[in-house]
Amino acid sequence: MAQHLLHGTLHATIYEVDALHGGGVRQGFLGKILANVEETIGVGKGETQLYATIDLQKARVGRTRKIKNEPKNPKWYESFHIYCAHLASDIIFTVKDDNPIGATLIGRAYIPVDQVINGEEVDQWVEILDNDRNPIQGGSKIHVKLQYFHVEEDRNWNMGIKSAKFPGVPYTFFSQRQGCKVSLYQDAHIPDNFVPRIPLAGGKNYEPQRCWEDIFDAISNAKHLIYITGWSVYAEIALVRDSRRPKPGGDVTIGELLKKKASEGVRVLLLVWDDRTSVDVLKKDGLMATHDEETENFFRGSDVHCILCPRNPDDGGSIVQSLQISTMFTHHQKIVVVDSEMPSRGGSEMRRIVSFVGGIDLCDGRYDTPFHSLFRTLDTVHHDDFHQPNFTGAAITKGGPREPWHDIHSRLEGPIAWDVMYNFEQRWSKQGGKDILVKLRDLSDIIITPSPVMFQEDHDVWNVQLFRSIDGGAAAGFPESPEAAAEAGLVSGKDNIIDRSIQDAYIHAIRRAKDFIYVENQYFLGSSFAWAADGITPEDINALHLIPKELSLKIVSKIEKGEKFRVYVVVPMWPEGLPESGSVQAILDWQRRTMEMMYKDVIQALRAQGLEEDPRNYLTFFCLGNREVKKDGEYEPAEKPDPDTDYMRAQEARRFMIYVHTKMMIVDDEYIIIGSANINQRSMDGARDSEIAMGGYQPHHLSHRQPARGQIHGFRMSLWYEHLGMLDETFLDPSSLECIEKVNRISDKYWDFYSSESLEHDLPGHLLRYPIGVASEGDITELPGFEFFPDTKARILGTKSDYLPPILTT
């Protein structure tokens, strides 16, 4: 049957199944083994646990809760609001019986996409069929209702944010908040000599903010509470390191600062991810070197409450799923919540809540500036914070290059800050143990209730919304029933309740976009349902989030209308780690497949319009790198790296990637998302890694009638100044052909400088073309002469792993 593109929203309801007879049949040898295992360990006998799923072709897009002990007539009555961007011939409803090891297939019902594509409501009983498409015993049927809304029926499609009345992303746990203030941070620190002149509306110039200085001040000035969550928190790092900007008390480590505040009576609570691999004797640092046990030991016996927090599964999953979640997934939110003085109320005792959200963990290797030096800070700010996990045996005693760190963070003030605190309270209540959260009700005469910090008339005011990827295994207070969950903007699964609003926020922002999108992210992979079956079975990958496909479909829709639209994506050269290792190569392989899927969409759309244009004028990928000539008086290491290693080659060539750890998207210079979530399935799933993000805009700086010139525009221009080493008039309009051609041209030139044999000057900027080619049909190819990243034997296009399960690397 012909496949149709379903791009929009599918409203689906699964009511009930009538007249089921007997269980389903397990297939083949494995089925017999599972039956024997169940009999031996005494599980899976007796009760039925029936649930239903919705698939668009082979992509799972919804699932009901389990109904226990209703073997004949299970009634779910569950409704789903499904974002779709899938080619499909059928919408498939599958009924299964769950058990601790896996699930038994009862049967499947099919509704052809032809029936829903025109938008009419379909409400019918559909026959349930077996694997051979014959009716199952007893002729059972499932009652479902479907209605499809094409993306162009959405009144926000292609419109951007039309006015200050824009209500935010619908169907989410947290509503959009008005009257907020946001500070945007590029990198952990900005030195005084980073001063791009970027004009904003109202005759102002953009002023960069300093993240770790502000966090230091916020912690230092807290009087009642300091709440911190992190993937990693390392007690031994210093937040203040710029000798030209000293602060009173700034020479302490964050661990000592938190102990001091706790001893003064401030409630200091830390939730740090418990890396389950870190107990393994063979992995003294854990796979990811998070220092979780060192941090716990540092605070033991002090007034600081530090909880190591495993990523526990929500209750009720199969044994296999539970093992996957607790050993493979992480707590990834990076937040700081403090009480703070009231702005401009001299002498007032009243306090408010201020929160920080973004990509920067308070740990080693994160302190950096937009200059991202490889060698020149090794005797100063990075001497005791030398981070280089991409080479075996790298150490300060052997010298650079260190791994520079590019990241983005935000400070939130106003009602939105309380939402971040509520997220912490939900997580602490679930996994923190003792009930020692500060009872704000008892402090109501000191800490104000959530209230605006700015009037809506103020030209600097923000509207902000909080988004998460999290489930009931990590947050308390989620409703039990699917109806209540849907009401609260949550998604109900087979055995868990999920907040997946970060993915929703990205989808919404992409669909609204008018002119351009600028993405910086540590990972870029997904929409595996649309990947080519080149050596893989796409439905086995399960990296099902929509973001890459939504981006390519947005470009396609603009090409079809003859309108301009550009997408710029910055990723790291490779994911942190040994670049030739199996996991890094597997992720690069998924990234290549994602890029290829997108470029094929773009090229097909151009061909359909009779255009033979360079697809990089619509969609373009970059990475960041630095290269420095040797200067007199530079740090001289006592030892050398081993000969003929990546480390030695990089040291001799004086170059290395700048690690892009950011998780940010800017749309039309008017809307920004900043958080902890990567563009991969782990971060976007909701039931894998736990994440948090903000999405916001300034209602007085929309790109409705003229280009937006508020803080978001200033922030993007400041980032481009950091990456390109220059400002240019063409950068003011990223949607123009002149702009994308110029940025591509500069990044091509910088890649040539970066990868050349000899080096006469420092690299003039950091933005490098991502070193791939795009063939005439959209296939991703090697750039001539670049099978491997410079100084390595690691393939740029990646290598499919035959032993690592996709759930680990997607």
UniProtKB/Swiss-Prot annotation:
Its main location: cytoplasm. The active site is at H332, K334, D339, H661, K663, D668. It is found in: Cytoplasm; Cell membrane; Mitochondrion membrane; Microsome membrane. Optimum pH is 4.5 to 5.0 in the presence of micromolar levels of Ca(2+) and PIP2. Optimum pH is 5.5 to 6.5 in the presence of millimolar levels of Ca(2+). It comes from the Eukaryota. Ca(2+) requirement for activity depends on pH. Active either under acidic conditions with micromolar levels of calcium (PIP2-dependent) or at neutral pH with millimolar levels of calcium (PIP2-independent). Pfam families: C2, PLD_C, PLDc. It catalyses: a 1,2-diacyl-sn-glycero-3-phosphocholine + H2O = a 1,2-diacyl-sn-glycero-3-phosphate + choline + H(+). Keywords: Abscisic acid signaling pathway, Calcium, Cell membrane, Cytoplasm, Cytoplasmic vesicle, Endoplasmic reticulum, Ethylene signaling pathway, Hydrolase, Lipid degradation, Lipid metabolism, Membrane, Metal-binding, Microsome, Mitochondrion, Repeat, Vacuole. Highly expressed in roots, stems and flowers, moderately in leaves, seedlings and siliques. Not detected in seeds. Its cofactor is Ca(2+). Transmembrane segments: none annotated. Residues 327-366, 656-683 form the PLD phosphodiesterase domain. GO terms for molecular function: calcium ion binding; GTPase activator activity; phosphatidylinositol-4,5-bisphosphate binding; phospholipase activity; phospholipase D activity. Residues 1-126 form the C2 domain. Its EC number is 3.1.4.4. SMART domains: C2, PLDc. A 1,2-diacyl-sn-glycero-3-phosphate binds at H332, Q522, H661. It is a peripheral membrane protein. InterPro entries: C2_dom, C2_domain_sf, PLipase_D/transphosphatidylase, PLipase_D_C, PLipase_D_fam, PLipase_D_pln. One of its GO terms (biological process) is fatty acid metabolic process. Belongs to the phospholipase D family. C2-PLD subfamily. Interacts with GPA1. This binding inhibits PLDALPHA1 activity and is relieved by GTP. C2 domain is a calcium-binding fold, and the binding induces conformational changes, promoting the protein association with membranes. These conformational changes occure at millimolar Ca(2+) concentrations. Also binds PIP2. A lower affinity toward calcium can be anticipated for PLD alpha due to the absence of two potential calcium ligands. This is Phospholipase D alpha 1. The lineage of its organism: Eukaryota, Viridiplantae, Streptophyta, Embryophyta, Tracheophyta.
